[in-house]
A protein has these predicted regions:
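Local sequence-structure signature of Cys/Sec-based thiol-disulfide redox active-site neighborhoods
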Residues: 1-29
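Short secondary-structure transition/capping segments
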Residues: 2, 44-47
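Short alpha-helical
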Residues: 15, 41, 74
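Thiol-based oxidoreductase modules, predominantly thioredoxin-like and allied folds used
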Residues: 29-43
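Short amphipathic alpha-helix with an adjacent loop that forms part of the alpha/beta core around
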Residues: 46-50, 79-82
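Structural micro-motif
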Residues: 50-60
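Non-catalytic, surface beta->alpha helical segment in thiol-disulfide oxidoreductase systems
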Residues: 61-84
């Protein structure tokens, strides 16, 4: 996985996760999807970032920043900023 790859932590049943993945696809962003229901380390990371909650999507960017349950516009703005 490239150092420039975005990591999306989510679940298969999460509508907001599917929406975020669509936005990433529309922006042709490189990302790695991790289902927290099948990855204990990923679930622990999401809980750590979200103070014990399993809030998804939790999106980790190459610059180290994290967005949790971002709106479509917030995610699009972040992607635009990364592509500068």
């Amino acid at each position: 996985m490239s150092a420039q790859t975005i990591t999306v932590y989510g679940t298969t049943w999460c509508g907001d996760c599917r929406r975020a993945l669509r936005v990433l696809d529309q922006h042709q962003a490189s990302y790695h999807y991790v289902d927290i229901e099948h990855d204990d380390a990923a679930r622990s990371y999401v809980e750590q970032v979200n103070r014990g909650f399993r809030s998804v999507p939790t999106i980790l960017f190459p610059d180290g920043s994290v967005l949790v349950e971002p709106s479509t516009s917030t995610l699009a703005q972040k992607l635009a900023a990364l592509n500068g």
